[in-house]
Amino acid sequence: MKKIYQKLILFFATVLARPILLLYRETLSIKIINKRYLKKFRSRNQNFILSFWHENMILPLLVHDGQGIHALVSKHFDGEIITRILRSFRLAAVRGSSTRGGKEAYQVLKRGMLNGPFEAAFTPDGPTGPRRKAKLGVVRLSSETGAPIIPIGVAATRYYRMGSWDRLLLILPFSRCVLYYG
């Protein structure tokens, strides 16, 4: 039964998630602040690392559709779901975490940065928390490659918080929201 359930979830993530999320995105009023940082780095073909809390991962996904960013994603089943959704948004997943395959994933990101231009995304508190307590991977990658870290903040007028460890932020349809590059 578990296998059938997992196959259904993966089918949803592969086939249905993108159209549903794009429709959902159309209901949001999204304001982007400091987008000039990304434009500046991209115009110079310079590497950078986007960093945001695990709880805020949905809005950056919707905003960065088609931009080819490489996101660090766990090797667990939840990570497979996220990987399939990322691919549908023309984003890349580098699989690994602090508990499984992290060293290999880190080396992939580091090689990408050193061979640049390369754009990476991290949730420094993921995949298992604790919530809003950053692990050192993002800082280490930045210090070893010279790539600046661009923190992302997210806010919304109407939202729901999931009961998960990260208290995932689900922005309600027809909300006003802000994505802020620091």
Where are the regions that the model predicts?
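Short, charged beta->alpha transition segments
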Residues: 79-83, 104-113
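Membrane-anchoring hydrophobic helices of lipid-metabolizing enzymes
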Residues: 1-66, 110-111, 174-176
